[in-house]
Amino acid sequence: MRKVGVGFDYYGNVVIVGDIVKARFKLDNPWKVIEIYMIDINTYNYHLGKGTEDIWINYKEVEFVSHDDGSCILANWI
């Protein structure tokens, strides 16, 4: 497992979970991305946080994480 992203875009904005994913996983606002790991080819483990809660979600699409307008996908590649 390799860390491939953190929760900030190129401009330093916090990356939020987009509308499509919120609906698919029944997440309410304001879930934010903490870190992103690549598990396998096109399979990612997303660490999300909201207040004092955090969850891990596996997902096969890189587009899992984005601003609602699609301006950020995986940011700050490490």
Each PLM stretch: what is its role?
Residues M1, K50-I78:
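Intrinsically disordered, low-complexity, charged/polar segments
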Residues M1-V17:
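Mixed-charge, Lys/Arg-rich low-complexity intrinsically disordered regions
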Residues R24-K60:
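Basic/aromatic-rich interaction segments and small domains that mediate binding to polyanionic partners
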